[in-house]
């Protein structure tokens, strides 16, 4: 799909291009001048227009994390990429490019309007994550298979579709097929769907649609079951007790234990293993239930902390707003009085009073902020102690339970070794009545061989138990450290932001006063 500007030199989406685009589309006049002076942060941009730029590759958009509308039409883009961070995107135009495949849209879960018309796309897929999609423009591509239409049934919000100019749109059954299989569609190829035609299409394809709905219902049920399992697993991971609500840890001990599996053929070992497994799983379940209980306590502690923090911040903000409101009321009266004053000495006196007033406001707001910092610091320190104590208690009790698992393993090891030695003696004396597999009998050549085999099995089991303990302890300690670190960093950022706001407000007040002095009075 060659375009006149394809012969131009391809451009790179670098910072200069993005800054220029943001500047051109930003606020104008006084607001625009202020924005240019202070600089517009990419994360604050909601809409970005980059059409007709001869862009070959999408890049450097990761900072536009709050972008809602992106226009990249009429370029020479060959691949959909570089959009991963734009999770708030609602509207995306990639029409009139050289795109051959739909890809790179998995994180755009809020996208409602997508235009891919006038490209080289031959297959409709890789849109599964776009659950809010309402408008899809795919006109003038290379789509030829009617099955692409059935794929679009997974988008419950889809109301507008454009496929005109594709080979598929030339099929005799094109419209009837779409009317039947996309029953909620309102507009097709820029025309409203004819309701009579829709009903006729439904009747014609009724049997096929019923079969398809049945398959979709079964698939949906499986997906919901898998989703529920995954959600439960995530809950268990948050509690650091995943896969401890059953025989998973015990089974993992034997999954790589070649010698242990051979030894299970010895007389009496099966019964020994069953009893061992039952007791081991009970301890794992105790760890699991205790972990969920402690996770709930940590959640309550964190929720209470966040509520206290927000309450303190809001109360402080209300006090600050009250001080500012009183200041602004008085300041406005003073400004009006200065404008009406004709005596120069009185004007200078009032200007001095206004400047002092601004200074007093600054001091008041900064004192409020310092008080808040101290209050929040105390709250954070209390929370840090509480959450650290909860984590420490959790680790201590879990380690005690895991020690019981080791005791069971040690006891099992002793019993297994006893059975193995007795079996060796029977084999050497020719008193072994039971048949054993050849690879098992090969272990009983001498005492050292069988003792080493039992010991190797025991070492594997202890290693699995130790690794699971390390995983749990490391996991919750890391979580606690990262949480506390983030809380401290967030508070530092909040404080810096607030101090900056106070300084900017005070500077603005002083600038307004200075402009009044230099303008209204001297003139």
UniProtKB/Swiss-Prot annotation:
The gene is Drc3. SUPFAM superfamilies: L domain-like. Residues 204-242, 333-393 form a coiled coil. This is Dynein regulatory complex subunit 3. It comes from Mus musculus (Mouse). Gene3D superfamilies: Ribonuclease Inhibitor. The keyword Repeat applies. Keywords: Cell projection, Cilium, Coiled coil, Cytoplasm, Cytoskeleton, Flagellum, Leucine-rich repeat, Repeat. Component of the nexin-dynein regulatory complex (N-DRC) a key regulator of ciliary/flagellar motility which maintains the alignment and integrity of the distal axoneme and regulates microtubule sliding in motile axonemes. One of its GO terms (cellular component) is sperm flagellum.
């Amino acid at each position: 799909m060659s375009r006149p500007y394809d012969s131009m030199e391809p451009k790179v989406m670098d910072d200069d291009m993005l800054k220029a685009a943001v500047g051109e589309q930003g606020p104008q006049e006084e607001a625009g001048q202020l924005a240019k002076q202070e600089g517009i942060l990419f994360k604050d941009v909601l809409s970005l227009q980059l059409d007709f730029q001869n862009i070959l590759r999408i890049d450097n958009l990761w900072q536009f994390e709050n972008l809602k509308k992106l226009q990249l039409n009429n370029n020479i883009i060959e691949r959909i990429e570089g959009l991963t961070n734009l999770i708030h995107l609602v509207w995306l135009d990639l029409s009139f490019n050289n795109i051959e495949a739909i890809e790179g849209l998995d994180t755009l879960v809020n996208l409602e309007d997508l235009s891919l018309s006038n490209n080289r796309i031959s297959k409709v897929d890789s849109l599964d994550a776009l659950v809010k999609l309402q408008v899809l423009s795919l006109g003038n591509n290379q789509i030829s298979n009617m099955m692409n239409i059935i794929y679009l049934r997974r988008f419950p919000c889809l109301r507008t579709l454009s496929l005109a100019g594709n080979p598929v749109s030339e099929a005799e059954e094109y419209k009837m097929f779409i009317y039947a299989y996309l029953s909620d569609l309102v507009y097709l190829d820029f025309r409203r769907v004819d309701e009579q035609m829709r009903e006729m299409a439904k009747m014609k394809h009724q049997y096929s649609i019923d079969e398809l709905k049945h398959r979709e219902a079964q698939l949906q049920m499986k997906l919901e079951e898998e989703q529920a399992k995954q959600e439960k697993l995530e809950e268990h991971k948050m509690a650091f007790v995943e896969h401890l609500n059953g025989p998973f840890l015990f089974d993992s001990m034997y999954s790589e234990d070649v010698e242990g599996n051979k030894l299970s053929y010895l007389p009496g070992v099966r019964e020994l293993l069953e009893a061992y497994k039952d007791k081991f799983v009970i301890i794992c379940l105790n760890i699991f239930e205790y972990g969920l209980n402690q996770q709930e306590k940590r959640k309550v502690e964190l929720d209470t902390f966040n509520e206290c923090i927000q309450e303190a911040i809001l109360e402080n903000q209300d006090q600050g707003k009250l001080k500012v409101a009183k200041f602004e009321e008085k300041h406005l009266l003073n400004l009006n009085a200065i404008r009406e004053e004709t005596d120069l000495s009185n004007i200078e006196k009032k200007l001095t009073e206004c400047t002092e007033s601004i200074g007093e406001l600054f001091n008041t707001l900064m004192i409020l902020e310092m008080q808040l910092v101290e209050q929040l610091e105390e709250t954070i320190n209390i929370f840090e102690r509480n959450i650290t104590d909860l984590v420490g208690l959790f680790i201590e009790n879990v380690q005690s339970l895991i020690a019981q698992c080791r005791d069971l393993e040690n006891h099992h090891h002793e019993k297994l070794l006893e059975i193995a030695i007795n079996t060796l003696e029977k084999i050497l004396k020719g008193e072994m009545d039971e048949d054993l597999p050849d690879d098992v009998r090969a272990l009983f050549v001498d005492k050292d061989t069988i003792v080493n085999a039992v010991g190797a099995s025991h070492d594997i089991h202890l290693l699995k138990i130790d690794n699971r303990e390390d995983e749990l302890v490391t996991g919750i300690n890391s979580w606690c450290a990262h949480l506390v670190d983030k809380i401290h960093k967030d508070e530092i950022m909040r404080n810096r932001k607030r101090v900056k706001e106070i300084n900017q407000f005070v500077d603005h007040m002083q600038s307004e006063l200075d402009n009044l002095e230099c303008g209204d009075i001297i003139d």
